[in-house]
């Protein structure tokens, strides 16, 4: 590798380097201790340790080339190499391309300048594409060289970054280097002859956290496959931890959670991931989440500055954050002040000429924001003016529409109940009013106490709007939060939900989108629409709005449109309940965008098939309970109770457990504070019921106590009519219990748990996501093992180890082949057995690792035939059940079962003639040849193929599962178990010849090799004579004489001699009658030979084989 020219003092360097070659201008040196017998003794040992500790390139590149000039002790290092061949190439290139040119220069300075320029040019050309995005390309090139030489990971494994740290091996810290790449965490250390190499793939990490104890002040704890690893002594531990967390989550999502990963094109190509890119992505995600911006926004600049707050008459210190389409500000001095300015709202951007370095941003509505002490404010103003010019024509202005619509209380004339025959016409009509406005218009003439309180709330908000502004760019302060906690007025609820959730921005950037999606989704029929239709009448059935076709049609349109927009989610139960509440207070199009905000940004991964997001937040909730309510965790040792109880809280934002008039106040807080509000309220509810819960003897009693509490939560200020309020319908029995006002409960949750920061929740979400997905994977494994264990003799522990190896091989092959198609077949929604399937290439690797017959010379052919036998539905993939059935027979099968397996491998559909194109490789098959032969299948009629495909995968290609098809498949599998040996087809002569060759290969190097050879020769001779006698009645000539003589005369033939005879024989039989054997004939003949019976019934230690396979699975591919 060419190096950036750096000065080296040769006088000191000679103690550590030995001269190999030299000329007038260059010196080739070798590191002391490298390439010497015994490693160079003590000197070599110390040099090696020094190189490792100081991160010297010489550890992995013990050769180097220096540029020298006469009469100077200062030399320049220009190249290094990992081995003699690599450095020799560089030396030869210098002699052929540089040496002749140097003689024309007059001065040594000109020579040095020319060499430096030439080497820098080579480095620039070499790293033009690879290292341009790194902070220090030169150091990164050196680290990459060490990473590649030390670990031998795949060529396309992308090194993201590296850190100096200590790895704790027991109680001893080992100083070394931690390398973080897209798929692996790797560590290398070399101290006084002791070398430590550690490779952990991210898919194995179940726990990643920062810890501290008496010995380690701060360390990073990594748990992988039950083993704990601790790394400490980082220079920037928070930065390191953040990157490790991102890489682990990225790998987990790519391999286990493809539902969300496929929607994330930024991370789809592992080769594009860089340290800087990951850091920028993390900052952008936090920025978007905090300000509720669309997912596509990325943080471009951050400036510390002061913002003038006009209604309070002071400057608040904070950070101005700028993305492509937004300018945002968040205070950092405890004032809880934030501002979001969409560039589409900006009219002018000016700067002041005084020393205040001020930027003034004027927006629609005669509002201006003044930012002081902005660094590089002149450049910033120029950039923002350019962006505003580009942004002004892209958006549809809806902020004024929101304000105007919220003041309108008159019902629309468009809402009439339609008959079933005109339902399609009704579906086309998009509601332009919130359902609450239509079904519960406020009557200003009959003002009761509740209506007066509602009017006072509205007046409070109008005062706030006068001070802080109204619309997207309003100041959001502590006063805003206080008003939200008290409950948003009915008339303003839809508008403020849109603002606080950020849905107003989505709607502005996508004008007419909803109308188009409604039209496109109209009339579609799939699993999602069927489920939607089933749940429409279950959505707030007690509310008049959803007892009429007006509300039902609106709900149908919103849910169907969203399922059409996001087919990865489609429709999930609980979405109907949430959407019903949104439609009560927001227009139909606004309700759609609120649903988008909830499902795609505020509650990510909540509404996919495995509700991973909800499970993650449950784990976060459990962690918060341990921290804030320790006495509860001590009493209820099984934390799964909280998970089961809280699931509906998170999925429906408490709507399913609280009366509707109280639940909407919770939704108010959710749209303002996000998931933080739900977690705080959950803690407050448990805290309020703490004494009751501590006296509960079991989970059922605890659930009853909580349900009774929820029934008694009220909203005394709710203006909803009594026929709509659910809290007013409680029975007399329940009224004896203390009532709790929702406003008081929310206020208490803010006072007690308001110090929980969003950053902490984000960190806990990332940390627990690993645990949740690995737990789901463990559940999948246990279900697979439970099904498979019924059909095999392997113990559960052996099956467990076999499954780990099976799955590991799948992932390793994906790491070594980035475009591996097998990952595309992984679908967590499929039945457990179908989630992980391997192709022929991966099966061959596992066969070589695990099969007791893998020593055979034709092991590739055996692996291929076994794969073809197991691949009954001809999709070139096999699952774990099929794989384990073959392994089980090889290890635990009886003599008859093993022989039957070998027999079936040598007849169709498993058997196909195999011959490598490269004669020098013998029976070894290339990847392409293996793929080709695995796809050669016995031809079947088209209709039979379709029937087979449907039979083996009844759930594929259909909207819903076909129960009849599953029952038919189950019945077929029962028949398969009762398969009679008499049903097996006969084996023809070419297949029998290959069968005989396979047996000879299996017996090779066995302790009883000679007796086995003699026994198989006797059996073969006997079979051929039997066939000859049987055919004499039909043919006067003996077609098998030549073959019989060959085998009988061989006695104990060598493998090579046997192979040559067997290959020649088929040619001599081509024009003669074909002979064949039944399985019973072969079985009876082999049973007569004790040596053969002993060979196949010899016990094999499957545990040792599995242990060895687990260890060597990664080592065989790397330099471990």
Swiss-Prot record:
Changing residue 246 to H: In NPHS20; rescues only partially glomerular filtration defects in tbc1d8b knockout fish; defective vesicular trafficking in podocytes. One of its GO terms (biological process) is vesicle-mediated transport. The record marks 534 as: Arginine finger. It comes from the Eukaryota. This is TBC1 domain family member 8B. Interacts (via domain Rab-GAP TBC) with RAB11B (in GTP-bound form). One of its GO terms (molecular function) is GTPase activator activity. It is linked to Nephrotic syndrome 20: A form of nephrotic syndrome, a renal disease clinically characterized by severe proteinuria, resulting in complications such as hypoalbuminemia, hyperlipidemia and edema. Kidney biopsies show non-specific histologic changes such as focal segmental glomerulosclerosis and diffuse mesangial proliferation. Some affected individuals have an inherited steroid-resistant form that progresses to end-stage renal failure. NPHS20 is an X-linked, steroid-resistant form with onset at birth or in the first years of life in affected males. SUPFAM superfamilies: EF-hand (SSF47473), Ypt/Rab-GAP domain of gyp1p (SSF47923). Residues 487-674 form the Rab-GAP TBC domain. Residues 1054-1066 have a biased composition (Basic and acidic residues). One of its GO terms (cellular component) is cytosol. The record marks 573 as: Glutamine finger. It is found in: Cytoplasm, Cytosol. Residues 145-212, 285-353 form the GRAM domain. The arginine and glutamine fingers are critical for the GTPase-activating mechanism, they pull out Rab's 'switch 2' glutamine and insert in Rab's active site. Residues 858-893 form the EF-hand domain. Changing residue 291 to S: In NPHS20; exhibits intracellular vesicular localization; rescues only partially glomerular filtration defects in tbc1d8b knockout fish; reduced podocyte migration; defective vesicular trafficking in podocytes. Kidney (at protein level). Keywords: Cytoplasm, Disease variant, GTPase activation, Repeat. Residues 1035-1066 are annotated as: Disordered. Involved in vesicular recycling, probably as a RAB11B GTPase-activating protein. Coiled coil: none annotated.
């Amino acid at each position: 590798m060419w190096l950036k020219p750096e000065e080296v003092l040769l006088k000191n360097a000679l103690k550590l380097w030995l001269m190999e070659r030299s000329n007038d201008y260059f010196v080739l040196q070798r590191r002391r201790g490298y390439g010497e017998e015994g490693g160079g003794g003590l000197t070599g040992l110390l040099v090696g340790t020094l190189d490792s500790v100081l991160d010297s390139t010489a550890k992995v590149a013990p050769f180097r080339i220096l540029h020298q000039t006469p009469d100077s002790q200062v030399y320049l290092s220009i190249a290094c190499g990992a081995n003699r061949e690599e450095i020799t190439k560089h030396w030869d290139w210098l002699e052929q391309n540089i040496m002749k040119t140097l003689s024309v220069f007059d001065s040594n300075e000109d020579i040095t300048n020319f060499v430096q320029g030439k080497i820098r040019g080579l480095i620039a050309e070499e790293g033009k594409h690879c290292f341009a995005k790194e902070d220090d390309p030169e150091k990164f090139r050196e680290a990459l060289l060490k990473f590649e030489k030390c670990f031998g990971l795949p060529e396309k494994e992308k090194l993201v970054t590296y850190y100096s740290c200590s790895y704790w091996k027991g109680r001893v810290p080992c100083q070394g280097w931690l390398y973080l790449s897209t798929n692996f965490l790797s560590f290398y250390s070399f101290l006084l002859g002791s070398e430590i190499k550690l490779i952990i793939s991210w898919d194995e990490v179940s726990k990643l956290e920062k810890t501290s104890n008496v010995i380690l002040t701060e360390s990073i704890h990594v748990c992988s496959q039950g083993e704990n690893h601790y790394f400490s002594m980082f220079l920037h531990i928070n930065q390191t931890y953040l990157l490790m967390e991102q890489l682990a989550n990225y790998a987990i999502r790519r391999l286990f959670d493809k539902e969300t990963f496929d929607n994330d094109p930024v991370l789809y190509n592992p080769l594009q991931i860089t340290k800087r890119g990951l850091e920028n992505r993390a900052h952008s995600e936090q920025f978007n989440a905090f300000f509720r911006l669309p997912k596509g926004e990325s943080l471009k600049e951050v400036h510390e500055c002061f913002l003038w707050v006009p209604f309070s008459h002071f400057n608040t210190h904070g950070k101005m954050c700028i993305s492509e389409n937004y300018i945002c500000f968040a205070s950092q001095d405890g004032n809880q002040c934030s501002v979001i300015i969409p560039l589409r709202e900006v009219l002018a951007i000016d700067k002041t000429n005084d020393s205040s370095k001020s930027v003034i941003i004027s927006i629609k509505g005669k509002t201006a924001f003044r930012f002081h002490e902005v660094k590089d404010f002149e450049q910033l103003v120029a950039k923002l003016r350019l962006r505003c010019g580009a942004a002004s024509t892209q958006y549809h202005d809806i902020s004024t529409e929101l304000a105007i619509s919220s003041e309108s209380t008159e019902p629309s004339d468009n809402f009439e109940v339609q008959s079933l025959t005109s339902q399609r016409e009704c579906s086309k009509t998009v509601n332009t009013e919130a359902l609450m406005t239509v079904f519960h218009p406020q009557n200003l003439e009959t003002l009761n106490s509740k209506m007066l309180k509602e009017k006072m709330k509205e007046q409070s908000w109008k005062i706030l709007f006068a001070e802080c502004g109204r619309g997207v760019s309003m100041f959001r302060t502590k006063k805003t939060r206080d008003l939200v906690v008290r409950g948003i007025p009915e008339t303003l609820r839809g508008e403020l939900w849109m603002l606080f959730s950020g849905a107003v921005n989505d709607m502005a950037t996508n004008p007419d989108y909803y109308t188009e999606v409604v039209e496109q989704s109209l009339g579609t029929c799939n699993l999602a629409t069927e489920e939607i239709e089933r749940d429409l009448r279950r959505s707030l059935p007690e509310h008049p709005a959803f007892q009429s076709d007006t509300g039902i049609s609106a709900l149908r349109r919103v849910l169907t449109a969203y399922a059409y927009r996001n087919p990865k989610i489609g429709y999930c139960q609980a979405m109907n309940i949430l959407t019903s509440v949104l439609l009560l207070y927001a227009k139909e199009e606004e309700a759609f965008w609120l649903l988008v905000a909830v499902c795609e940004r505020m509650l990510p991964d909540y509404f996919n098939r495995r509700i991973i997001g909800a499970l993650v937040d449950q784990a976060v909730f459990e962690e918060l309970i341990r921290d804030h309510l320790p006495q509860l965790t001590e009493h209820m040792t099984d934390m799964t109770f909280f998970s089961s109880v809280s699931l509906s809280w998170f999925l429906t934002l408490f709507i399913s457990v609280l009366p509707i008039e109280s639940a909407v106040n919770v939704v108010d807080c959710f749209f303002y504070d996000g998931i933080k509000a739900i977690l705080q309220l959950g803690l407050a509810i448990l805290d309020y019921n703490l004494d009751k819960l501590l006296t509960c003897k079991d989970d059922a009693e605890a659930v009853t106590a909580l349900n009774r509490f929820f029934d008694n939560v009220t909203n005394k200020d709710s203006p909803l009519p009594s026929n709509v309020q659910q809290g007013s319908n409680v029975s007399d029995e329940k009224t004896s219990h203390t009532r709790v006002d929702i406003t008081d409960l929310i206020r208490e949750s803010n006072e007690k748990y308001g110090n929980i920061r969003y950053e902490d929740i984000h960190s806990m979400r990332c940390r627990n996501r690993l645990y949740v997905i690995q737990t789901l994977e463990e559940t999948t494994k246990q279900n697979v093992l439970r099904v498979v264990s019924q059909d095999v003799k392997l113990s559960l522990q052996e099956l467990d180890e076999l499954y780990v190896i099976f799955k590991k091989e799948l992932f390793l092959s994906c790491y070594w082949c980035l475009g591996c198609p097998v990952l595309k077949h992984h679908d967590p929604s499929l039945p457990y057995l179908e989630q992980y399937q391997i192709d022929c290439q991966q099966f061959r690797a596992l066969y070589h690792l695990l099969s007791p017959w893998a020593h055979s010379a034709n092991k590739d052919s055996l692996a291929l035939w076994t794969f073809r036998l197991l691949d009954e539905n001809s999709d070139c993939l096999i699952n774990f059940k099929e794989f384990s059935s073959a392994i089980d027979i090889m290890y635990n099968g009886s003599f008859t079962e093993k022989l039957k397996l070998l027999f079936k491998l040598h007849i169709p559909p498993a058997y196909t003639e195999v011959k490598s194109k490269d004669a020098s490789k013998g029976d070894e098959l290339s990847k392409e040849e293996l793929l080709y032969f695995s796809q050669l299948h016995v031809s079947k009629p088209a209709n039979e193929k379709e029937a087979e495909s449907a039979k083996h995968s009844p759930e594929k290609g259909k909207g819903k599962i076909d129960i009849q098809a599953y029952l038919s498949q189950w019945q077929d599998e029962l028949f398969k178990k009762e398969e009679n040996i008499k049903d097996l087809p006969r084996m023809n002569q070419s297949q029998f010849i290959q069968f005989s060759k396979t047996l000879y290969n299996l017996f090779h190097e066995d302790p009883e090799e000679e007796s086995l050879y003699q026994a198989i020769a006797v059996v073969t001779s006997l079979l051929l004579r039997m066939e000859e006698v049987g055919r004499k009645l039909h043919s006067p000539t003996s077609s098998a004489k030549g073959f019989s003589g060959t085998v009988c005369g061989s006695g104990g033939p060598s493998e090579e001699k046997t192979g040559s005879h067997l290959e020649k024989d088929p040619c001599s039989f081509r024009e003669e009658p074909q002979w064949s054997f039944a399985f019973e004939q072969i079985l009876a003949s082999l049973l007569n030979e004790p040596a053969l019976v002993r060979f196949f019934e010899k016990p094999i230690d499957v545990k040792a084989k599995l242990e060895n396979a687990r260890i060597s699975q990664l080592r065989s591919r790397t330099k471990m």
